[in-house]
C-alpha cells in the first residue's frame, strides 16, 4: 500500500524529495552556450524543468522547435502564449548541428502548439528528423508532439519520418481537462497515440501524466488502462510543480511511495517501461530509457 504522508500544497513548502541542486557545472555552461549560439529553444528552460542542471551537465537537452510562443494556454505550462513568430526554415539545420556538436546518442524534439499552421508544424518535425538522420545517423530520435487537434492526419507526416520514439503526453485525467488543458481533447490524444502504433508498430509510443492536480488514484489507473488500450509502450508519471502564481495550484505533493505504487500497477498492466517519481518528466533519462525499451522488446520477442 502507498503512504498517506502526502503533503497538501497550501503549506507552500516543497518537501525534501522535490529539492534539486542549482545548475553550476562547466558541462551545464557549455551546453547552455552552444544552444544559445545556435539560436535554439529548449523546453528545459521554457518550461522551467527542475532537472535542467542534471540533464545539461550530461549534455542532454530537449530542443523546442517552431518558436517559443504557443497558441494554447494550458493552466500548468510555463511556455508563453500569444501570436507565434514565422517558422524558421533554417532551424532543422541548426538543430542537426547541435546534435552533431554535442555528440548526442539520443535527442528529444518537442514544440509549442502551432494551431496557426495548416499541419500544426508536422512537416517541420519531419524535416528536423531527416536532417538529423543525414548528419548523425547513429543518433536515436524521440519526438514529443502536440495533439495536432483538427489537423487531419498531421501526426502521419511525423510518423512517416520514422522517429524511434513518438511521445505525446495525455497530461492529466479526463475530469480535469477543462481546468488543466482546456484547448485539448482527451480522446483525441488517445487516438493519436493509437494511430501512430497502428501505422508503424516498430515506433515506440510514449505518454505521460502529472499528478498532484486533484485527480484520484482510480482516475490515474483508468488512464493507464486507456493508454494500454491504445498500445502505448512507455508511461511517465511525475509531480506537477506550479511554475508561477498565475498557474493552476498544486493540489498536493504526492509521496514517493505512491509513485512506486503507480509504477508497480502500470507494469502489471503491460507497459514495457514505466518511469514514476516526483521529478520524472517526459524527457528525463530519455536516452537510457530508449535503450531499455529496445532490450525489453527483444526479450518479449524471444
From Swiss-Prot:
Instruction: State whether keyword Iron-sulfur applies.
Output: yes
Q: What class of enzyme is it?
A: transferase
Q: Where's it found, cell-wise? A: Cytoplasm
Q: Which Pfam families match?
A: Radical_SAM (PF04055)
Entry EC no(s): 2.8.1.8
Q: In which pathway does it act?
A: Protein modification; protein lipoylation via endogenous pathway; protein N(6)-(lipoyl)lysine from octanoyl-[acyl-carrier-protein]: step 2/2
List cofactor names only.
Answer: [4Fe-4S] cluster
Where does the chain bind [4Fe-4S] cluster 1?
44, 49, 55, 283
Report the CDD domains cross-referenced here. Radical_SAM (cd01335)
- The protein's superkingdom reads Bacteria
Which residues are noted in the entry as [4Fe-4S] cluster 2-binding?
70, 74, 77
Q: Boundaries of each Radical SAM core domain copy?
A: 56-272
Q: Which reaction does it catalyse?
A: [[Fe-S] cluster scaffold protein carrying a second [4Fe-4S](2+) cluster] + N(6)-octanoyl-L-lysyl-[protein] + 2 oxidized [2Fe-2S]-[ferredoxin] + 2 S-adenosyl-L-methionine + 4 H(+) = [[Fe-S] cluster scaffold protein] + N(6)-[(R)-dihydrolipoyl]-L-lysyl-[protein] + 4 Fe(3+) + 2 hydrogen sulfide + 2 5'-deoxyadenosine + 2 L-methionine + 2 reduced [2Fe-2S]-[ferredoxin]
Q: How is the cofactor bound?
A: Binds 2 [4Fe-4S] clusters per subunit. One cluster is coordinated with 3 cysteines and an exchangeable S-adenosyl-L-methionine.
Write out the GO MF terms: 4 iron, 4 sulfur cluster binding; lipoate synthase activity; metal ion binding
Which InterPro entries does the entry link to?
Answer: Aldolase_TIM, Elp3/MiaA/NifB-like_rSAM, Lipoyl_synth, rSAM
Which keywords has UniProt assigned to this entry?
Answer: 4Fe-4S, Cytoplasm, Iron, Iron-sulfur, Metal-binding, S-adenosyl-L-methionine, Transferase
Give me the Gene Ontology terms describing cellular component: cytoplasm
Q: Does the keyword DNA-binding apply?
A: no
Looking up PANTHER family in the UniProt record yields: LIPOYL SYNTHASE, LIPOYL SYNTHASE, MITOCHONDRIAL
Q: Which family does it belong to?
A: Belongs to the radical SAM superfamily. Lipoyl synthase family.
Recorded hits in NCBIfam families, A to Z, give: lipA, PRK05481.1, PRK12928.1
Q: Which HAMAP family match?
A: Lipoyl_synth (MF_00206)
UniProt protein name? Lipoyl synthase
Q: Which gene encodes it?
A: lipA
Amino acid at each position: 500500500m502507498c503512504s498517506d504522508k502526502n503533503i497538501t500544497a497550501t503549506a507552500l513548502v516543497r518537501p525534501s524529495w522535490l529539492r534539486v541542486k542549482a545548475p553550476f557545472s562547466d558541462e551545464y555552461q557549455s551546453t547552455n552556450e552552444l544552444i544559445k549560439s545556435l539560436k535554439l529553444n529548449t523546453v528545459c528552460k521554457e518550461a522551467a524543468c527542475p532537472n535542467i542542471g542534471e540533464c545539461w551537465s550530461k549534455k542532454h537537452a530537449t530542443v523546442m522547435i517552431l518558436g517559443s510562443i504557443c497558441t494554447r494556454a494550458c493552466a500548468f505550462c510555463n511556455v508563453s502564449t500569444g501570436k507565434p513568430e514565422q517558422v524558421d526554415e533554417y532551424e532543422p539545420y541548426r538543430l542537426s548541428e547541435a546534435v552533431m556538436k554535442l555528440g548526442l546518442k539520443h535527442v528529444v524534439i518537442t514544440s509549442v502548439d502551432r494551431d496557426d499552421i495548416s499541419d500544426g508544424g508536422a512537416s517541420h518535425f519531419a524535416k528536423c528528423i531527416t536532417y538529423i538522420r543525414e548528419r548523425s545517423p547513429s543518433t536515436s530520435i524521440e519526438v514529443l508532439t502536440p495533439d495536432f487537434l483538427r489537423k487531419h492526419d498531421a501526426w502521419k507526416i511525423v510518423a512517416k519520418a520514422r522517429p524511434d520514439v513518438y511521445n505525446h503526453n495525455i497530461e492529466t485525467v479526463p475530469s480535469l481537462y477543462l481546468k488543466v488543458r482546456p484547448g485539448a481533447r482527451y480522446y483525441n490524444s488517445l487516438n493519436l497515440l493509437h494511430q501512430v502504433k497502428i501505422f508503424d508498430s516498430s515506433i515506440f509510443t510514449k505518454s505521460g501524466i502529472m499528478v498532484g492536480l486533484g485527480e484520484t488514484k482510480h482516475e490515474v489507473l483508468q488512464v493507464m488502462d486507456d493508454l494500454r488500450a491504445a498500445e502505448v509502450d512507455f508511461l511517465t508519471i511525475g509531480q506537477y510543480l506550479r511554475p508561477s502564481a498565475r498557474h493552476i495550484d498544486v493540489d498536493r505533493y504526492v509521496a514517493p511511495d505512491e509513485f512506486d505504487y503507480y509504477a508497480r500497477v502500470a507494469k502489471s498492466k503491460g507497459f514495457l517501461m514505466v518511469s514514476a517519481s516526483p521529478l520524472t518528466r517526459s524527457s528525463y533519462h530519455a536516452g537510457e530509457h530508449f535503450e531499455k525499451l529496445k532490450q525489453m522488446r527483444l526479450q518479449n520477442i524471444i
